[in-house]
Design a protein with these regions (language model features):
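Active-site core of glycosidic bond-cleaving carbohydrate-active enzymes
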Residues: 42-78, 82, 98, 105-131, ...
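Secretory-pathway/luminal and periplasmic proteins that interact with or process carbohydrate-rich
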Residues: 10-20, 34-40, 61, 74-79, ...
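Short, glycine/acidic-rich hinge or "gate" loops at secondary-structure transitions
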Residues: 18-27, 133-135, 153-162, 200-207
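Short, small-residue-biased leader/transition segments that mark boundaries at the very start
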Residues: 4-5
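Acidic/histidine-rich catalytic neighborhood
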Residues: 143-197
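Carbohydrate-binding/catalytic loop surfaces
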Residues: 25-38, 85-104, 159-179, 226-239, ...
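Long, K/E/R/D-enriched contiguous segments that form extended
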Residues: 17-46, 50-53
Length: 327
């Protein structure tokens, strides 16, 4: 319908060829001090911009984002690598706010490197371009895994967890937060899949298999039947925070599914329902995708109709329009 046409037009107009990736406002801005500096927010926004790319057959529009990530991640001595070096880790990491020059600032967001890599893998999954996987995606995915090899620590149960992490954009910093665990799990799983495609079987892959076997997957059911957001702090029922960071495994990742384990799907439903339906446009779009994954078409449709209210915004936001296409 009309929203699909709008979404496709925005994608085609803001991300193709040798351009920079689509930012918070696509590429359209008419002021010197735009909201959030018209940057690349790594904790949902730039990723959500590209959710529709493959599923709407606009795969070529992915190129600017993939180029941006691979270039900055592998740039010797670049700002993303410097973030990792400050923590005595290989690889790279980013903060929440990032710009076209590779600058990264405001609140470190380590799991974003794993999240970005899921996009690199998704592009291969849709295109089956083995040359792209070998030359572009694999080098980034490998060094990102190495970052987490250096970063993860063993908890009291002998599982590997990400220390001192957050759940955007609220709550405490703890070890083993669901947001980080679920994304690192996806990274390791998809990197092993890439290794299988490329027939890579070396010391790195052996270490990856060993780490993956001990990795906490971030799926734990709490006292009121929900997917837990934190390990130590008890989740607050009725918390309407707009981020759904503890449900990364539901969407955009796929560890949670009724086809895999009904218990986790039901717990995800409890957690998602607790967030409520009211939110910003981009958050509502994310909820549409999550409810669709949980096979609740009526709830997804109701939220989608709310998200289509284009008169209810004060800032042009690309992710509002992109997020409603889920699969």
């Amino acid at each position: 319908g009309s929203e699909m046409c709008i979404r496709d037009s925005l994608m085609l107009g803001s991300s193709r060829g040798g351009q920079l990736p689509s930012n918070l406002q696509g590429l359209w801005n008419n002021v010197n001090n735009p909201a959030w500096e018209c940057d690349y927010h790594s904790n949902i926004n730039v990723q959500m911009n590209y959710w529709p790319a493959e599923v709407t057959n606009l795969s070529e529009c992915y190129a600017p984002f993939i180029t941006y990530v691979s270039t900055e991640a592998l740039k010797d001595g670049g700002s993303w690598q410097q973030v990792a070096r400050k923590e005595n880790c290989r690889g790279w990491a980013v903060h929440t706010q990032n710009n076209i020059f590779g600058y990264t600032d405001w609140l470190i967001n380590r799991p974003a490197n794993a999240w970005y890599c899921t996009h690199l893998w998704q592009h291969y999954a849709y295109t089956l371009n083995k040359e792209y996987l070998r030359d572009t995606a694999w080098p980034v995915m490998k060094v990102t895994c190495q970052y987490w090899f250096d970063r993860l620590k063993e908890n009291a149960e002998g599982r590997l967890v990400a220390p001192n992490e957050w759940s955007p954009e609220h709550g405490p910093w703890e070890d083993g937060v669901a947001y980080a665990q679920q994304l690192v799990y996806a990274l390791f799983e998809e990197t092993l899949a890439a290794a299988d495609v490329l027939a890579v079987d070396d010391a790195f892959v052996s270490e990856l298999k060993e780490k993956f076997s001990r990795l906490d997957n971030g799926l734990h059911i709490g006292s009121w039947g929900q997917i837990k957001e934190w390990t130590i702090q008890e989740d607050k029922q009725g918390d309407h925070q707009r981020h759904l960071s503890h449900l990364m495994a539901l969407y955009p990742c796929d560890q949670i599914s009724y086809l895999k384990d009904k218990r986790y799907a039901e717990a995800a439903k409890v957690a998602l329902d607790s967030r409520g339906d009211g939110a910003t446009g981009w958050s509502r779009a994310w909820k549409v995708a999550c409810w669709a994954r949980l096979w609740d078409g009526e709830r997804a449709y109701r939220l989608l109709k709310q998200a289509q209210n284009i008169t209810d915004v004060t800032v042009v936001s690309m992710d509002d329009n992109a997020g409603g296409v889920y699969e």
